[in-house]
């Protein structure tokens, strides 16, 4: 029996989908434990780019079972479209995908509430993706939400109506101009619910328990990144779920002592989409070049990501919070061609150098302290072994390992699953 965990260590978009895809053949079960369709996992192979929003990244592998855990929130409409997109590739979704009855449903009115709430904030917007994630988790913690298991109940529509009516009253309270046709949205929602019923619903915590007893190997897949965690992220510019390792336990019903390896994924630089503090953000041509070469546009929102140098203060913090045992560095190829690279090793926080991640990293409080490295000019995308990598990149990697005290086991040198170097 093996239970391993894979998660992002920055503000999301680290490349988790590709690594899950690379590792999937080693596992019987791939289980998503938090988040919703606000984040996309991008996989690229055979010249085709695939973006998964709710479905685990193991869906492309014939032998793996994919679980959507209780910590996930599901928009039936988005979910149906995702399934339809996958079925074009002749994937047998029904036999490979199962859903926890305890996963919460995103209603059309959750999305409208999200839009109304964000609009009401004016300049204080937090950069919500407007997918209804926050309002759905609010209903979950407020004990008002609807869950997948409720679909099986005879009075599901009555439960839906009661909650939707509450939402409409809240939308009116915000007193902002939002155009929508709820009848049309609800028609689409209930059609998608009928499609959702065709899949298998399970008591996922019992399923996971029995799988462990049977000696199955399980990979728990996180969405977004650790710095977006509702507790440990850059609050309030965070998501509404626990994106850290603890979220795998609460989002799947797995005991903490069952988890063996914790794989931490990070980019060789840093990106962030939307609002929020970002100490190493670049506002010059270097940052623009990173975004262009790295194709840094959100897979779900299409928004351009903000780019900056690698931040070891934030990375060490994420490693500590998650108990990371192995690191995987993504997009090393994007840094090819830069004469000089920088890595943030400390923050100057209110006039004093510190090496820990403080409560407030707003720019008026924090200035990054950098160490410079000589860049490399070689194209990495065709390299297949660690020995082939340029000496400057090896120095960069080894410095990171020394600073964070965790080994880097994988270096990604391109988007395709084949462009993955094992160290």
Q: Language model features by range: what are they?
A:
Residues 1-423:
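Non-transmembrane, aqueous-exposed alpha-helical and coiled segments at domain scale
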